[in-house]
UniProtKB/Swiss-Prot annotation:
This is Core-capsid bridging protein. The gene is L2. It is found in: Virion; Host nucleus, Host nucleolus. All late proteins expressed from the major late promoter are produced by alternative splicing and alternative polyadenylation of the same gene giving rise to non-overlapping ORFs. A leader sequence is present in the N-terminus of all these mRNAs and is recognized by the viral shutoff protein to provide expression although conventional translation via ribosome scanning from the cap has been shut off in the host cell. This protein is only encoded by mastadenoviruses, and may therefore play a role in mammals tropism. During virion entry, is ubiquitinated at the nuclear pore complex by host MIB1. This dissociates viral genomic DNA from capsid and allows genome delivery into nucleus for infection. One of its GO terms (cellular component) is viral capsid. Residues 17-49, 307-340 are annotated as: Disordered. The lineage of its organism: Viruses, Varidnaviria, Bamfordvirae, Preplasmiviricota, Tectiliviricetes. InterPro entries: Adeno_V (IPR005608). Belongs to the adenoviridae core-capsid bridging protein family. Associates loosely with the viral DNA to form an outer shell around the nucleoprotein-DNA complex and links it with the capsid by binding the endosome lysis protein. During entry, secures the viral genome in the capsid until it reaches the nuclear pore complex, preventing innate immunity responses. Dissociates from the viral genome at nuclear pore. Might be involved in nuclear capsid assembly of the viral particles through its association with NPM1/nucleophosmin. HAMAP family: ADV_CORE5. Monomer. Homodimer. Exists in equilibrium between monomers and dimers in solution. Interacts with the histone-like nucleoprotein; this interactions bridge the virus core to the capsid. Interacts with core protein X; this interactions bridge the virus core to the capsid. Interacts with the endosome lysis protein VI; this interactions bridge the virus core to the capsid. Interacts with the peripentonal hexons. Interacts with host NPM1; this interaction might play a role in virus assembly. Residues 22-31 have a biased composition (Basic and acidic residues).
Amino acid sequence: MSKRKIKEEMLQVIAPEIYGPPKKEEQDYKPRKLKRVKKKKKDDDDELDDEVELLHATAPRRRVQWKGRRVKRVLRPGTTVVFTPGERSTRTYKRVYDEVYGDEDLLEQANERLGEFAYGKRHKDMLALPLDEGNPTPSLKPVTLQQVLPALAPSEEKRGLKRESGDLAPTVQLMVPKRQRLEDVLEKMTVEPGLEPEVRVRPIKQVAPGLGVQTVDVQIPTTSSTSIATATEGMETQTSPVASAVADAAVQAVAAAASKTSTEVQTDPWMFRVSAPRRPRGSRKYGAASALLPEYALHPSIAPTPGYRGYTYRPRRRATTRRRTTTGTRRRRRRRQPVLAPISVRRVAREGGRTLVLPTARYHPSIV
């Protein structure tokens, strides 16, 4: 046996490699014991028995009696009310408005503030629902707000009468053309009582089950002072005798119609605008600016357009042929300096004795 094996056997006898549980270290300090301190009872039991017992004693109030916001818990639609012990309830969600508009009692929910209409910090007195987002009259702009009119007269409501139009909620809104100014439309236009308005009834557009929107366009014919003034102005420019007689008759008819309408609708008299005859415009002294094109050279790949300036660029060929030089003696090639056109300049004296040399510029004939 080797010496190493003998040493291992001797060590196994003296200190065997068997590890038992670790020894616990003895604690040098003792745990401190806390004594409970009992409160002394007041010896006022006899006095309390003689007094009146208060059943609903209130706590001492603060200076400011602040109460938090009263929150009414509302169960959101779509949540499944199932009690599973040991599990949390799922997070609530709001429905998509495509699904909300599919309910048949949509208006009742909005009126009673149920379901999706039960949310919000502030209570809104008037609730509006956008039933239609289309614009059947894009050329008009609104002047007044869209007001809801009662379907029944107040006397009929008092008597408790019911009609077929009880479920209707008609709205009225005044609209004018977009291209006209609002001041001209409201101030200068007058309504002719004799003419009947043009009524156009559009088809019913379904919004929700049992709910639809129908647009009725009522076009009211109006007359403005500007149109009459332009009519008389155009009539006064006629020179032939027959046309002038017809024009005088037309002016008298328009004035008579205006006087009739002014007695009923408008109190101010009609104001006719008399303008001077237009003079013919003189001929121009210069041509169009687009005709003044510079002389330019086109790329060889571009074919020139007939009728326009410009030529195809062709590189100039030298008249003399290039001589072949011997390999021993090569001449140095010099670049030609470009031939520049003479530029007319002018000297401008500035403050401080400085003189600037500026080129003279050619201006367009329309620039003074």
